[in-house]
Curated annotation (Swiss-Prot):
Extracellular side: 25-517
Organism: Arabidopsis thaliana
Protein name: Senescence-induced receptor-like serine/threonine-protein kinase
GO cellular component, one term: membrane
Functional note: Involved in innate immune response of plants.
Amino acid sequence: MAMLKSLSSILFTSFALLFFLVHAQDQSGFISIDCGIPDDSSYNDETTGIKYVSDSAFVDSGTTKRIAAQFQSSGFDRHLLNVRSFPQSKRSCYDVPTPRGKGFKYLIRTRFMYGNYDDLGRVPEFDLYLGVNFWDSVKLDDATTILNKEIITIPLLDNVQVCVVDKNAGTPFLSVLEIRLLLNTTYETPYDALTLLRRLDYSKTGKLPSRYKDDIYDRIWTPRIVSSEYKILNTSLTVDQFLNNGYQPASTVMSTAETARNESLYLTLSFRPPDPNAKFYVYMHFAEIEVLKSNQTREFSIWLNEDVISPSFKLRYLLTDTFVTPDPVSGITINFSLLQPPGEFVLPPIINALEVYQVNEFLQIPTHPQDVDAMRKIKATYRVKKNWQGDPCVPVDYSWEGIDCIQSDNTTNPRVVSLNISFSELRGQIDPAFSNLTSIRKLDLSGNTLTGEIPAFLANLPNLTELNVEGNKLTGIVPQRLHERSKNGSLSLRFGRNPDLCLSDSCSNTKKKNKNGYIIPLVVVGIIVVLLTALALFRRFKKKQQRGTLGERNGPLKTAKRYFKYSEVVNITNNFERVIGKGGFGKVYHGVINGEQVAVKVLSEESAQGYKEFRAEVDLLMRVHHTNLTSLVGYCNEINHMVLIYEYMANENLGDYLAGKRSFILSWEERLKISLDAAQGLEYLHNGCKPPIVHRDVKPTNILLNEKLQAKMADFGLSRSFSVEGSGQISTVVAGSIGYLDPEYYSTRQMNEKSDVYSLGVVLLEVITGQPAIASSKTEKVHISDHVRSILANGDIRGIVDQRLRERYDVGSAWKMSEIALACTEHTSAQRPTMSQVVMELKQIVYGIVTDQENYDDSTKMLTVNLDTEMVPRAR
């Protein structure tokens, strides 16, 4: 009976394995994603036959790029020719459903090849996370290094999240993401995951790596370079064709083996771990591939350092046997010895293949699954335009914008306790998903376009103490239970600015009053409308007088830029649906032209910027073209409708980042590059235009950032040309912004290119410090240049650098940047550098370029800064 049970168990296991292998061969357990190829596209790899699909369905951020042309014809696999990079966020995540869901074991592999896709020639470094837990660091040697990172784990959820995390050493990217279903009975350990350290095929020199279809799990086997001390055995027969071993190394891998050339009694396998304290599991795969005589055998003992861990291991002909270290191993150097026992007919040890995995213990506990599901539903329902990727709460440094979480102890899942998605362009009804946030205390949905009634389930959230739904389009009656909780003080309820929403005890009275007393209000409203119409006509008439009669007030100007009718502008902006910016000129709206996003600047009737400034901006943008100046797509010039259409800048303006209005914190490297971009744009205005142009309103909010965080100068309505033959001065009424205005202007009432230099210097100081141009206290207002000078006089560079950087910056470049900024903000223009000199100095910081200074006068080779003494900051 026992023998029958054993036979039954073997047959069941064999059939299960056979079923699994059949499915592995048809790729039903594979997910293969080529990052960066066009949306919804796919193809079959020419070598492996694996079907790769676009990553567009698995990620909602990032920029797709193709590697540099010089590498595209170098024989690299097709799936390495494109990448998706992530310049905008600290953490960016793929969310991928696993082939069989949770509870099954998977091999998850990411592949990276830089290929100079961004034309920067700087190989980035960044971190890789699986969900909330650190996986590994990504470090590439050069542009053509192909790096594979693999991890084996059993997910707790149906989806896995693979995240790249920026650590201020270049922009993270991903080339390939692959998931492979494994047997749960393989790679068994008591730990959360195993990270691949190496996987070796003891084979012939020059052999290519083996993978699918040779390997049913699509593991990539790297050929080992064999030294002269060893020799290679091989066979042309298939190894393990009867599916003897669940690990199933590729037959092409197992058909070769390594042994000592002098038929030594032992074979030594050694490796030096990158971390001597880390724990490793070692998997040795063996198969006899030589035909032995009847009296011959190949067996050996396996030793770890000085201890035997397998007293006798005997090989079988053309069948794979796998030895796994019973416990994890560690140390500075790990030595395995395969030792042949004495005997005339015992052959020396061999090895066919080897895998080494590092133990990965998941120390971070993810957000409670109920909260995760709720937040994902909210994100999907409202298409929230925030950086909501990965786990909502963990790691704390990368938690979702607008949420706060709490974790009662180190063994429980964090819970969402506060959610602020006010002014987030939410539309539709309040979704039932909010009812699953059972730990939430504060919920702010104000400033959106939510419709329908306030759902009663909000009153049942047991921990809710603050609810704000102001400024929506909600209708009906506030639920009685919410009203009662508001009255008894257990809930702070705000629901104003919803015209069709009322409390239960006031609605009937309001309706009665509206029915019986509508005549008088209608009369009053009619009178008000007439008065307002008359006032508007009068103001419009006065505005026309102020703007003058410059001839071309209606219709196209003399420019090659595209002219749009106002009706077209209405369509481009979808009836001015989405405001993306505001200023003294009016509002900026989001628009789309032929599928491309644009920014639509509409001059309001009340704007201080009149037709003169509008015409100046069109004229200037018509003749300037530079990568660091915003480009004009088109314009509209109809009576009462003046519109400028620019290229769309996805990351808005520098001012928002410095003021902390965006959750993303600019790294030191990004700040340096943005500063250089802005300086290059201004340098082009000063030296690349004939006649030269002074911007006159340089400030952070006029420095726009595209999806790559490339900076471009904007807002040229106040710009003016100046003469280089004459004094180079512009006599002008006041222009510019307080804090950025050239101090000489107050005495001379004139501005020149050095005025832009001063303004840029103030911007550079803001970039360094993260502080505003003017800091106000109860007793005084201090300009940022005076504040920085006073601190640097004591040699304290760390005292001025933005604390949000947490000292993740180069001290030397911080000193140099400060020197440049203070030189630019000298009170006397003659002591300031030219914009060309500023660009030269910034390039030295950003690129480490040693520039040729022979074209500059000796007196301007060094930017000096006048502090309280004549000291120049050099304490680096």
